[in-house]
Amino acid sequence: MCDAFVGTWKLVSSENFDDYMKEVGVGFATRKVAGMAKPNMIISVNGDVITIKSESTFKNTEISFILGQEFDEVTADDRKVKSTITLDGGVLVHVQKWDGKSTTIKRKREDDKLVVECVMKGVTSTRVYERA
């Protein structure tokens, strides 16, 4: 069910990411460095456990989870959040909650690309990845 996401993906375009990070509460210096990074995303599945790694010159992160089960996550900008990821109509829906706030990250396949849509309040960022 998540096989379409498995593989190594490289960032090829990013829209509105600085505004999204600002809405999340990421500081200026971190936004500038993170905004210039071109991360690779590596997605793998082992039984029920899905792993998403992000590797860049800015920071490397890794989360492993089971669909529908809440887990603790430390984000690339060091927020400590409670995350839940579900599969809804072929879209991986990742909800992060912290300090009474929440953001949603949707990962979906479109043609041969992986499209990541990050939403915080009224701000949306779209980041497009291609197979590496």
Swiss-Prot record:
SUPFAM superfamilies: Lipocalins. A motif (Nuclear localization signal) lies at residues 22-32. It comes from the Eukaryota. Keywords: Acetylation, Cytoplasm, Lipid-binding, Nucleus, Phosphoprotein, Transport. The modification N-acetylcysteine is found at residue 2. The modification Phosphoserine is found at residue 13. The keyword Cytoplasm applies. A fatty acid binds at residues 127-129. Transmembrane segments: none annotated. The modification Phosphotyrosine is found at residue 20. GO terms for biological process: brown fat cell differentiation; cellular response to lithium ion; cellular response to tumor necrosis factor; cholesterol homeostasis; fatty acid transport; long-chain fatty acid transport; negative regulation of DNA-templated transcription; positive regulation of cold-induced thermogenesis. Gene3D superfamilies: 2.40.128.20. Belongs to the calycin superfamily. Fatty-acid binding protein (FABP) family. Forms a beta-barrel structure that accommodates hydrophobic ligands in its interior. Monomer. Homodimer. Interacts with PPARG. This is Fatty acid-binding protein, adipocyte. It comes from Homo sapiens (Human).
